[in-house]
From Swiss-Prot:
Annotated Pfam families: MoaC (PF01967)
Function: Catalyzes the conversion of (8S)-3',8-cyclo-7,8-dihydroguanosine 5'-triphosphate to cyclic pyranopterin monophosphate (cPMP).
GO BP of this protein: Mo-molybdopterin cofactor biosynthetic process
Reaction catalysed by this enzyme: (8S)-3',8-cyclo-7,8-dihydroguanosine 5'-triphosphate = cyclic pyranopterin phosphate + diphosphate
Pathway involvement of the protein, from the record: Cofactor biosynthesis; molybdopterin biosynthesis
Descriptive protein name: Probable cyclic pyranopterin monophosphate synthase
Amino acid sequence: MPEFTHINGDKVQMVDITAKGEVKRMARAEGTITLRSDTVAAIRTGTVLKGNVLATARIAATLAVKQTPQLIPLCHQIPIGAITVDFTDTEVSITAEVTVTSYGRTGVEMEALTGVSVALLTIWDMVKSAEKDENGQYPVTGISDIRVIEKIKG
């Protein structure tokens, strides 16, 4: 049976990291939102009514990274050294990639994953009127494949 560091019987606790040494940390995460091709084209050409979708998603991801300990209960507050947010697209999707670096006692995977998640949710929010069908449903739109693609310690 695996050993869980945050769980002791029916008690949940934040792991004590005070004895760990500080080292450089980096995590890169990505995730994808699937959209209608017309929506991706509107994002590319800057014709979405709400404004610049990717600039807004980039700001949202950056804010989310910095707020991760307020969203995930047992996540440590750590000093963030840098955040980069990049986007790539296909005809029917946009992939967000968030890289977070820090110098500290614990990793930054949760921060990178939170940044990706909020970037993709922001894109959805900004284009939802274009994505809905005649019944107000989202038959094409979906968020998937959110994962850590790289982690460096030291």
